[in-house]
């Protein structure tokens, strides 16, 4: 398999586990398959592995993954793939799974929107939030001319914001994280949020307000963007209005609209599985109500679930570990310790 996998072609042979989704959870599940000596296949709807980390914020810095005090999203994907690729998992890109079928012998067959079929002994859904699209600002009307140019819903290249006047719209972790990351690079940062308080982590809020006190960033709470001026795809000004009626005009060369995404499970929602909070309900073994069909990461629901990368990695480990009992019924499953397994592999 080639790095960031080239799509395979033709009808594929039966493998032990098909993993639907090639984000962090899916990639780590592939590593866990290798650790447990079972074959796997990742089917990813995007042209690259990495899920949201690759598609939405490859340059964002992440701080809450164990052993990484700070890591860029794209680098985390590379590290995860570096772990998994030693076991040569099959990777199928640009294919969205449409439906599954459980066969009489207990194995599974999935079919993609293009009509390709893949067979495996068990199935793991690690498709994140499903298909996602950014939430926009409907009050601005049709701004498609600016989208992807000076109105952005994710940051693909931080260098284009170097020395620019940037307006960030939003109040969650993503909005405030980008505000803090861009402070050393942008000419000026303005953050506008329609609510009276931010929804981000406490420390991030404290850091932003501290920067505001130093005059490094302007913060507007209870405020919405009501209009913009532009020259073709070039943004010139933005106009803000607070809930008290105060209006503010500011120069802005870029506007980052970071107010979240609308998720859609797409065909997965039609599988007839129990759903809660737009996710598949699983038990303590990450199994759905269908024996042999597991879910992990953001698409898996259980009481107390946290939708963060770290939890997804744990989910993947649990799902693969317990699917062994389905793939190899009646066999005693031994606990694999990575240090021992890697030492044996190096001595081969």
Curated annotation (Swiss-Prot):
Keyword Flavoprotein in record: yes
Protein name (Swiss-Prot/TrEMBL): Ferredoxin--NADP reductase
Co-factor note (free text): Binds 1 FAD per subunit.
SUPFAM superfamilies: FAD/NAD(P)-binding domain
Amino acids binding FAD: 25, 44, 52, 57, 97, 132, 298, 339
Pfam family, one: Pyr_redox_2
Superkingdom assignment: Bacteria
Known catalytic reactions: 2 reduced [2Fe-2S]-[ferredoxin] + NADP(+) + H(+) = 2 oxidized [2Fe-2S]-[ferredoxin] + NADPH
The EC number(s) this enzyme carries: 1.18.1.2
Cofactor dependence: FAD
Quaternary structure, from the entry: Homodimer.
Similarity-based family: Belongs to the ferredoxin--NADP reductase type 2 family.
Molecular function (Gene Ontology), one example: ferredoxin-NADP+ reductase activity
Keyword NADP in annotation: yes
Record keywords: FAD, Flavoprotein, NADP, Oxidoreductase
């Amino acid at each position: 398999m080639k790095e960031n996998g080239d799509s395979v072609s033709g009808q594929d042979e039966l493998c032990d586990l098909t993993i639907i989704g090639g984000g962090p959870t899916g990639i780590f599940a592939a590593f866990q398959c290798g650790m447990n000596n079972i074959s796997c296949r990742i089917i990813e709807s995007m042209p690259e592995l990495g899920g949201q980390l690759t598609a939405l914020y490859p340059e964002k810095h992440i701080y809450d993954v164990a052993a990484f005090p700070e890591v860029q999203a794209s680098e985390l994907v590379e590290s995860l793939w570096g772990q998994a690729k030693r076991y040569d998992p099959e990777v199928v890109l640009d294919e969205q799974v449409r439906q599954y079928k459980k066969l009489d012998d207990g194995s599974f067959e999935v079919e993609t929107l293009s009509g390709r079929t893949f067979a495996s002994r068990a199935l793991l859904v690690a498709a994140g939030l499903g298909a996602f699209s950014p939430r926009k600002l409907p009050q601005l009307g049709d701004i498609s001319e600016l989208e992807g140019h000076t109105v952005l819903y994710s940051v693909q290249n931080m260098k284009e914001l170097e020395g620019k006047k940037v307006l960030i719209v939003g109040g969650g972790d993503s909005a405030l994280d980008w505000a803090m990351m861009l402070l050393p690079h942008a000419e000026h940062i303005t953050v506008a949020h329609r609510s009276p308080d931010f929804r981000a982590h406490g420390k991030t809020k404290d850091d932003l307000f501290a920067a505001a006190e130093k005059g490094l960033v302007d913060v507007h709470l209870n405020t919405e963007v009501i209009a913009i001026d532009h020259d073709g795809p070039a943004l010139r000004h933005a106009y803000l209005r607070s809930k008290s009626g105060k209006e503010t005009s500011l120069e802005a060369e870029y506007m980052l609209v970071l107010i979240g995404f609308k998720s859609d499970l797409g065909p997965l929602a039609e599988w007839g599985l129990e759903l809660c909070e737009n996710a598949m309900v699983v038990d303590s073994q990450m199994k759905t109500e269908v024996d042999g069909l597991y879910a992990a990461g953001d698409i898996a629901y259980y009481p107390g679930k946290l939708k963060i990368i770290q939890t997804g990695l744990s989910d993947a480990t649990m799902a693969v570990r317990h699917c062994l009992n389905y793939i190899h019924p009646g066999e005693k499953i031994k606990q694999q310790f990575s240090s021992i397994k890697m030492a044996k592999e190096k001595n081969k």
